[in-house]
Amino acid sequence: MNLFSKIKPIILSERLILRLPLIADYESWVVLRKKSEDFLNKWEPEKDVNYYSKNLFKKRVKWAKKNFDLKIVLHFFIFLRSNYQLVGGITLDNIRYGPFQSATLGYWLGEEFSKKGIMTEGLNSMMIYASNNVGISRIEAATLPNNIASRRLLEKCNFKYEGVGQYYLQIRGKWQHHILYAITFDSRKSNSKKILGF
């Protein structure tokens, strides 16, 4: 529990812990990502050749902490409360204030933990945290048209279809159209969660 007891912010839900990544998470992250490469690569942009290097991971950890302190990115790892096992990650990026109060959503989950409702629980917890602690009122997301699991997740969490982003993002070296979703918090319906942080 030493990696969790003194860290803030920590978001707790029924089964999950969400927190900033630490350098100590490196080995667990490499194992999970490599085990899930085939599962994840078809949905994600191509990776840097040094993607799995510890040095680059350290830079991402510092980036996450710096941008959290600036309140412009929330980049959290997701762990099981039962055994503190790393299962995935969730990010709110491009956080904008003023008249926008919005952010862009990204997430990933290890293959062995899919279809268990984990990301649904994690996303609902993140949305409550973002609304209550950061002042975000709108979250936008984009997914490939054939990523049925991702579309079902967003729709289950009450994201609404907004259209198609033409040649929105490069996946596997090719510009791909994406389905665009968004949620505003006055339309969100979710169970209350115990949330600590900020």
Model region roles, listed by residue range:
Residues 1-28, 32-39, 75-198:
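Acyl-donor (CoA/ACP) binding surface of acyl/acetyltransferases
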